């Protein structure tokens, strides 16, 4: 079994440590397939073997983020587009090296995108995947993304009612 694998949204959205970190990559990819995962988002600086990933029929997105750093708003938006596109292909798993900081940050942003507040999303991710979201900069990007999302939503609603 891969290190630190668990669902945040059962069957739809999961996090884990880098596939192939403590067992052969092929075994970890087979594990994901059995659990209904259809796509992988890799946040490590070094990508996975894309040929092997696609050989298992998995979709793949590489968004490199240095360890202990946070993804950019543009990377979060690219992830959400990929998540929407992958919706019909089964669940999506996000990974960084240990499956904690960068992974937890991106999972929390997905929950914010689906309507949770930043505080709720951080609490849920940390409850389901302790310890997640390692640094203040990772926490801050979740709050920044939530504020941006709220600002865009209020402008769209204002345009409809104005």
Task: Please give the residue ranges for each predicted region.
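Cys-dependent protein tyrosine phosphatase-like superfamily
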Residues: 1-93, 107-162
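Conserved G/P- and acidic residue-centered "switch" motifs that form tight phosphate/ATP-binding loops
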Residues: 99
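Short cysteine clusters
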Residues: 96
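Transmembrane helix boundary and interhelical junction motifs in multipass membrane proteins
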Residues: 102-105
């Amino acid at each position: 079994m891969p290190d630190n694998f668990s669902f945040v949204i059962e069957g739809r959205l999961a996090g884990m440590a880098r596939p192939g970190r403590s067992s052969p990559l092929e075994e970890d990819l087979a594990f994901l397939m059995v659990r209904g995962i259809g796509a992988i988002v890799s946040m490590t600086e070094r990508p996975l073997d894309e040929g092997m990933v696609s050989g298992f029929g998995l979709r793949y997105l590489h968004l490199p983020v240095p360890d202990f750093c946070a993804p950019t708003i543009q990377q979060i938006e690219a992830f959400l587009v990929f998540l929407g596109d992958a919706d019909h292909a089964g669940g999506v798993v996000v990974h960084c090296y240990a499956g904690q900081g960068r992974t937890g940050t991106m999972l929390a942003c997905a929950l914010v995108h689906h309507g949770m507040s930043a505080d709720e999303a951080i609490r849920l991710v940390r409850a389901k995947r302790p310890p997640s979201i390692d640094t203040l900069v990772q926490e801050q990007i979740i709050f920044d993304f939530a504020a941006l999302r709220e600002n865009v939503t209020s402008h769209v609603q204002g345009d409809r009612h104005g």
